[in-house]
Amino acid sequence: MTILPSPVSRLSISSRVAILLAFQVLIGPSAHSQAAPPPSQLTKEQIVQRIDQAVQQRTDGISGYTVQEQYDLYRNSDPTPAAQETIKTTYTRAVGKDYTPIAQSGSSLLRSTVIDHVLAGEKELNLAANREGTLITSKNYEITPQPGTAEVNGRQCVLVTLKPLRKSPHLFNGKMWVDSTDFTIVRLQGTPSQSPSVFAGQATVARDYAKVDGFAMATHAEAHSHTFLFGETTLKIDYTNYKIDRDPTASH
């Protein structure tokens, strides 16, 4: 990079990368895996295999969906969002994502340079040609199950660590909690495996999932970053009103 980004560009890059990491795993595991033996009876290789199967079943099972997404961007310790945007997202497997704005408030500059930039990047990531390379599977990550189980959001989960097999701002180092019975994603935490710019602050992501019509879908995400001039920035996203179109040809 030869041109030093403006302050707004720095904020845009940090927030964009963080939330893109959260968004890209929306195409995550499903809740249609067959019942499995307790994790204690499975080898690490078998657990990874079950996670891969759950991801594939979700990819095959959902032909499309719509969801309402609420974006709230915060600066430092200010309890009032500096910018907000509500959108309706329409996803189809063949095409990817499309957005319909519902409401906007706060700084138009921050919306255009951060939130709208994030949405544009997410749209690119969800193109059919790009989607396979962002899935949380053993093709893209070294997945290492940890011993035992833990309760997360009222569900018994297996914790696995994630290490990308290649450097990419679209992949991340982190942790994932999967349901111990069907190996669908429950929670994700991570940081980019590669910063897009030496000027961008470190970004971290946390994202929660719940079963909607039998599939694991994102319900809440938070991306935190820090820049020299802007300090702490947080982008919060809430997902509601899912309507899922199942693929009738998919096996369950």
Locate each region found by the language model.
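N-terminal secretory signal peptides that target proteins for export/translocation
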Residues: M1-S14
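N-terminal compositionally biased, intrinsically disordered segments and leader/signal-like regions
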Residues: I3-L4, A31, T90
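Bacterial N-terminal signal peptides
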Residues: R16-G28
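Structured extracytoplasmic
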Residues: Q34-N173, S180-I185, S193-A203, A210, ...
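Beta-strand-dense domains in secreted/periplasmic systems and polymorphic toxin scaffolds
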Residues: L188, T219-A221
